[in-house]
């Protein structure tokens, strides 16, 4: 038990944001500072700081890529989300909705796989309950097989007119590859643009090969550095810098989100290889 060993700062990445609250509260009772790392600990005031990437900005970057690639009107749009138990999944979707909703409202995109999203398509801002309805219907649970199964079910339920050149909001790289595989296997899909997140090696290769359109690079070297800096700041008796707050259901948790980068075929060499994030020899087909 780290608390009985006398730690002064605890950095926690919660698998389940609400379930982690008990651990955070035990730490706080012992006078330990708690930093929530990447995912937010929910429903407790026992969180001193949140180190994360700007999850809303991630969703906005994904959606903006789809908007930039779309031409004309009536473009089929398929929406997918992360896990309903993960606060980040809501933030990603919030960011994506910020960008996509005006383009749904003006007819650029037509939602093809979510009656819940269609029902709120005229609303620029969604309540948490409205968003939960949408996320619950399009959740992949961050799982490759769940994502592929859902995509296949969506494609089976739609007609050839709902396909053609399609645009797909996929929440991360694992689900993006699964969904891309499903859409690539459908004879009525003539082309697809699909988003991703995390710059996983397999997805970087997919981008090089033209199987995945983009990913959002969240350089973990930056996040780790920011977490360590925050911990040291607490140990020195000071308070880390705050530019944002994130409400965890109990209060607004202070944070300073780290920057993210959109990556596609045009800048994959510079953003992923030249930056030292992944070595060139791990990939084939680089120019």
Residue ranges of each PLM-predicted region?
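A residue-level marker of the well-folded mature domains of exported/periplasmic proteins
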Residues: 1-287
